Amino acid sequence: TWAISNAMVDAGMKPEDVDGMLSYSGNDSTHAPWVAGDLGIRLNFYMDVHGGGSSTEALIGIAMGVIEAGMCKTVAIYRAMNGYSAVRIGGTGARSAVPITGDQIHHRAYGWQSAGQMFAPTFLRHMYDYGTTPEQVAGVKVAHSKHASNNPKAYYKKRYTIDDVINSRIIFKPLHLLDCCVETDNATCIIVTRTERARDCIHPPAVIQSVVGLSLIHI
C-alpha cells in the first residue's frame, strides 16, 4: 500500500482515479482486492500472474491491453517483497526457504533452486546458437551500473566495466557473480494510463511505445 500510495501522490492521482491493479505471485504476494480495499480503490480489473523477474515488464504490456480494451482506465502495477530479510531463494537456516509446490517438485528437489540456475542453460543455448559472448552478456551489468550510479535510491552506485564482470567468480556457468542480481527488500509501483490522462499528471509522462514477448525454452 505504501508504494501505491506514493505512486499516486507522485502522479497527482487519487484512489478513485485508479480502477485496475496488476501484480505477480512470488510466495508472499498480497492479492489486489485486499490491497485495493485498504487504499479505497474500486477495481474494474485485476490480475495476479505467476512469475518473477521480468514479470513487471510483461504486466506493463497487459496493462496497455486492458486499457485499450476499455476494461479500465488506469492501472497500478505493484509488488512488495522481502527478498532479503524473509523468504530467500534456496534459503536455509535462520531465513526460510521458498516452499516446493506444483511443477517445482520436478526440479527444486534436485537442486535447481535459483533464477541463476534456471536461466544459465538459456544463456548457454543462446551462446551456442548465436555466438553470444560472456563479454556481451556482461554489457548488461555495465549498463545497469551506469543507470544505478545516477539513481539516488539505488543500493549500489559503483560503475562496473566489462573486465570487472568477467573477472568476478563464476556462479552458474556462464553467469558470473556480477551478472546476477541482488536480493533486496523492496516495494514499488508503476502507474499506467492513457496518454491524454497522463498529460494531466504532475510529471511529464513516459510514453510506452511497444512491448514484446517470448516463449522461453531452457534447453
Feature locations, PLM:
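Conserved catalytic cysteine-centered active-site region
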Residues: Y24-Y78, N82-M118, Y156-V182, L214
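Conserved AMP-binding/adenylate-forming core of the ANL superfamily
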Residues: T1
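Conserved small/polar residues in nucleotide/adenosyl-binding loops
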Residues: I217-I219
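Active-site-proximal alpha-helical scaffold in enzymes
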Residues: G51-M81, G116-N150, I190-E196
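Phosphate/pyrophosphate-binding loops at sites that engage ATP/ADP/AMP, CoA/4′-phosphopantetheine
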Residues: S5-D17, H126-G131
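N-terminal extracellular/periplasmic Venus flytrap/periplasmic-binding protein-like
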Residues: G139-S215
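Beta-strand segments within the central parallel beta-sheet cores of soluble alpha/beta enzyme folds
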Residues: P15-Y24, F45-D48, V75-A80, Q136-V142, ...
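Generic structural marker for isolated residues within well-ordered, non-membrane alpha-helices
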Residues: I4, A32, F123
